[in-house]
Amino acid sequence: MSESSNSKVNPGGVLAGKVAVVTGASRGIGDAIARRFAMEGAKVVVSARTVDSGEHYLPGTINETVAAIRAAGGEALGVKADLASAADREQLIAAAEAEYGGVDILVNNAAITYFIPVEDFPEKRFRLMTDVQVWAPFELAQRVLPSMQERGSGWILNISSHAAIHPEKTLSGRGGTVYGMCKAALERFTTGLAQETYENGIGVNVISPGLVATPGVMHHKLINSENEDRVTPVEHMAEACLRLCHGDSKALTGRIDYADEVMREFDLQAAELI
């Protein structure tokens, strides 16, 4: 699929005037989503734990994402938030509302993951994973829903994984049970919330990326000769996310999709990111 040459902010784009909160937006998929939404005119609240370089072993920071958006003529606000913290979850939405008003789009992308077999999984890490991957999306949705319902419009997009699908019993591999459990819970939450908010003009969806060459994936050497032909460009993920955050919410809500499926269904071309 060819890439578009347009990489600048369009103030009259499909998200013009909308306020989007993107968690886990300092690198990888979250960074790409934040940039793509800004290109369509959204005011983007860029949230993550890493503010400056050197704070994390992986490259990418809030400041870098915000700077890239502003350099291209877009609007962005950086908000440091550890989503395992109740105070930070509250402060994130409060900061977005104080700066821009009500939130129109919430993208729950942040995650923390440990691959440990069930019998060895420490309670502290279990609670940390479920706090960030299940409770945080739930609470953030609770916090943005009142203003969305008042306006009669809004979008909530949850980033999942193929791990939500039940594994083959005959395949070897241990340690992914808790991660898969979290993503399965997130998907069931999504379809339930989509049903609850259907009449309120709010679209609630899930997108799973497949295998994307993010800094984390590259650091852990998860791409090899056996799967390199199945890598999804991060631009495709951002484009698919954009498509499920605008338009007729009743026609688009309650979806559980892979990025490439959305690209094919809507015949999308991935834009070059700012």
Q: Where are these predicted regions, by residue range?
A:
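C-terminal helical subdomain
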Residues: 199, 206, 225-274
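Conserved internal alpha-helix within the Rossmann fold of NAD(P)-dependent oxidoreductases
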Residues: 136-141, 155, 165, 186, ...
